[in-house]
């Protein structure tokens, strides 16, 4: 895949850097694994905005992804697909024994025709899913469970991974991309490899319209609002806010710790973000 630089033939294409889709399937998603998804526009069931800057954008179909990887038979990767609902790519896997298909997160380097498996005692290859107790120290994994059988929750975005750095009884030590080191039960599953599309962080959309296509609305500065709308609002002329930067709800934005104290999972965290 990689990235592509657009020629500056228009003002909006000048400086634009996008993710190349070469190598991805151009067809429609697997019909049995996709369904229509209604956009909420950032509103909750009362119609009130709970997530700002969301709305509009192109229609999307949600892809059903196998995050649990409970099948123990071999699967063949049919194609690699773009998914509008997440940053990484998907791999469509076909199982010949019962002629079924499923989507999995595509790891970096996987290609059509590759064999993927899940279960204990299998090879350490990208796309294979097995319990953490069977993964060598130093390996990079993604799609890690926090509870056995609950499905992948850690390291699912583009270019993300966790590294197995040690063992402690029934637990495995994982170092996350944030620098946090935490304990995870060794019976939890993880998939070998790094999530695909690591170059997504280098993209530059080039124009506001491309953000709108993605369903992202503009972000208005607090100092441009009225006092009723933001703590930085109001003032005569163009003022700088008059206080340390805060969110619309008055929470400090520069370095304030937001993690709850005495959280249940504190005992599983050996090193905070570093």
Curated annotation (Swiss-Prot):
The UniProt similarity line reads: Belongs to the universal ribosomal protein uL2 family.
Pfam families tied to this protein: Ribosomal_L2 (PF00181), Ribosomal_L2_C (PF03947)
- Keyword RNA-binding appears in the UniProt entry: yes
The record ties this protein, via PROSITE patterns, to: RIBOSOMAL_L2
GO-annotated molecular function:
rRNA binding; structural constituent of ribosome; transferase activity
What Gene Ontology cellular component terms go with this record?
large ribosomal subunit
Region (Disordered) residue ranges read 30-54, 223-274
Per its UniProt record, what Gene3D superfamilies does this chain match? 2.30.30.30, Nucleic acid-binding proteins, Ribosomal protein L2, domain 3
| Name recorded for this polypeptide | Large ribosomal subunit protein uL2
Per the UniProt record, the source organism is Wolbachia sp. subsp. Brugia malayi (strain TRS)
What is the role of this chain?
A: One of the primary rRNA binding proteins. Required for association of the 30S and 50S subunits to form the 70S ribosome, for tRNA binding and peptide bond formation. It has been suggested to have peptidyltransferase activity; this is somewhat controversial. Makes several contacts with the 16S rRNA in the 70S ribosome.
């Amino acid at each position: 895949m990689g990235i592509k630089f657009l020629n500056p033939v228009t003002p909006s294409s000048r400086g634009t850097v996008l993710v190349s889709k070469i190598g991805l399937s151009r067809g429609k998603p697997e019909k049995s694994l996709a369904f229509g998804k209604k956009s909420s526009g950032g509103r909750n069931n009362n119609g009130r905005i709970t997530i700002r800057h969301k709305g509009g954008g192109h229609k999307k179909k949600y892809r059903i992804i196998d995050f649990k990887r409970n099948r123990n038979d071999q699967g063949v990767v049919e194609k690699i697909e773009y998914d509008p609902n997440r940053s990484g790519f998907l791999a469509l896997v076909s199982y010949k024994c019962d002629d079924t298909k499923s989507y999995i997160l595509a790891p970096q380097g996987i290609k059509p025709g590759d064999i993927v498996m899940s279960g204990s005692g299998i090879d350490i290859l990208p796309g294979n899913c097995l319990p953490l107790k069977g993964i060598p120290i130093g390996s990079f994994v993604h799609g890690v469970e926090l509870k056995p059988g609950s499905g992948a929750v850690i390291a699912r975005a583009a270019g993300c991974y966790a590294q197995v750095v040690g063992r402690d009884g029934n637990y495995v030590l994982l170092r996350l991309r944030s620098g946090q080191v935490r304990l995870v039960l060794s019976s939890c599953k993880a998939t070998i490899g790094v999530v695909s599309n690591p170059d997504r962080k280098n993209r530059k959309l080039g124009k506001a319209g491309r953000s709108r296509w993605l369903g992202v609305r503009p972000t208005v500065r607090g100092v441009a609002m009225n006092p009723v709308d933001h703590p930085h609002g109001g003032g005569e002329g163009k003022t700088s806010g008059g206080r340390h930067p805060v969110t619309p709800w008055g929470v400090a934005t520069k370095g304030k710790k937001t993690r709850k104290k005495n959280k249940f999972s504190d005992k599983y965290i050996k090193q905070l973000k570093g």
